[in-house]
């Protein structure tokens, strides 16, 4: 996957997306947002503002690889979980690179601050949106998706925060310089 800024991004093409009820429930459970659905709405608004249709399709295709690899063996939980985790890792790494590539050109001070505070929720919302875009989005149960995303959230707290830790000081410089 490539994380270069494309023409769609620089032209600020907005996606028209909505979370399904299943997606909203999964994210609310993983991030304990039942009392704060406005945050989830803000994340979706951020994603629709900056994620291009091409980039979302790239993530859908990454998740579709799971179905292609496993074929009819969708009920093998360990294999399915492993393939999903690999695809999610690829999406997270690419999305992080994508945000890095647009931070100078497109992200406002407020948006950069929003990203630094909610990067894991933003990334996992992108993942759930990509799964929702699949025609076969019911290939994984809500409970399994909650478990996988909870695991990914825990791993992200270790790995992504190390990357974000390098990104945040730079964001702080950008935020302070533009006051």
From Swiss-Prot:
Superkingdom of origin organism: Viruses
Protein name: Uncharacterized protein L582
Species of the source: Acanthamoeba polyphaga mimivirus (APMV)
Origin organism lineage: Viruses, Varidnaviria, Bamfordvirae, Nucleocytoviricota, Megaviricetes
